[in-house]
């Protein structure tokens, strides 16, 4: 009939407390699919995943895995987790403009040596530094003089770093000879390969330190 009322037990029949696990309950049994899901969530939070207990332990404190837990953006990475986007780069990743790189690769050495040769400084391959001195440095194989060469950011040129037009280099290698000969040719002078000097037409040049 229309007015038939359901039994008392039908209205008040509520599911038992243990039928549906709450959001924060720990799953007693954790399958392979559940483990992969929880492990992925735990990795995002940079925590440690315990496959036996199927729990995610954050750095320092164990956390209860929840279905709706979202990893925070500013979570600190643990030693064994993948580095997050906000992890600070290491000291050696990108050297700043004024910092001296501790480790200097072969490509870096060639670049710095070329810059140092242009300024007639001394290049220290161990420390990867260019010391500006009045005396010319030993030229590197890859140093090519350019008209628009800019001094490197790591070294501060001193007053005596740039030799005058008529200065005599004490040691003149094959690369330095080519460089000096090219400069001398631009001035329409005569280049002496033995003394590595450029004599202007008619008068020999006098060396000056400044």
Curated annotation (Swiss-Prot):
This chain's function reads: Used by the larvae to construct a supramolecular structure, the larval tube.
The residue ranges flagged as biased composition, category Basic and acidic residues, are 25-41, 99-115, 167-183
Keywords in alphabetical order, please. Repeat, Secreted
Cellular compartment(s): Secreted
Q: What is its main location?
A: secreted
Region named Disordered: 1-210
Repeat as UniProt keyword = yes
* Protein's recorded name: Balbiani ring protein 2
Q: Where are the sequence repeats?
A: 1-3, 4-6, 7-9, 10-12, 13-15, 16-18, 19-21, 22-24, 25-27, 63-65, 66-68, 69-71, 72-74, 75-77, 78-80, 81-83, 84-86, 87-89, 90-92, 93-95, 96-98, 99-101, 137-139, 140-142, 143-145, 146-148, 149-151, 152-154, 155-157, 158-160, 161-163, 164-166, 167-169, 205-207, 208-210
- Any one cellular component term from GO for this entry? extracellular region
Region annotated 11 X 3 AA tandem repeats of S-K-[HP], chain positions: 137-169
Compositional bias of kind Basic residues: 1-24, 42-51, 64-98, 116-125, 138-166, 184-193
Region entry 13 X 3 AA tandem repeats of S-K-[HP]: which residue ranges? 63-101
């Amino acid at each position: 009939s229309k007015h038939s009322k359901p039994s008392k037990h039908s209205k008040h029949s509520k599911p038992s407390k243990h039928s549906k696990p709450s959001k924060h309950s720990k799953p007693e049994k954790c399958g392979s699919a559940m483990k992969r899901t929880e492990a992925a969530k735990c990795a995002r939070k940079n925590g440690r995943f315990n496959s036996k207990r199927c729990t995610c332990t954050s750095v320092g404190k164990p956390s209860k895995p929840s279905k709706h837990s979202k990893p925070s953006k500013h979570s600190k990475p643990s030693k064994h987790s993948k580095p997050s986007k906000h992890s600070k780069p290491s000291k050696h990743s990108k050297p700043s403009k004024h910092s001296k790189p501790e480790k200097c690769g072969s490509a870096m050495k060639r670049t710095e040596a070329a810059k140092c040769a242009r300024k007639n400084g001394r290049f220290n391959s161990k420390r990867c530094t260019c010391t500006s001195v009045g005396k010319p440095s030993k030229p590197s194989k890859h140093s090519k003089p350019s008209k628009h060469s800019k001094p490197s950011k790591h070294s501060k040129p001193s007053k005596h770093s740039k030799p005058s037009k008529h200065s005599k280099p004490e040691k003149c290698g094959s690369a330095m000879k080519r460089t000096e000969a090219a400069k001398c040719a631009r001035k329409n002078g005569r280049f002496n390969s033995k003394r590595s000097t450029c004599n202007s037409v008619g008068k020999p040049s006098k060396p000056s330190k400044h």
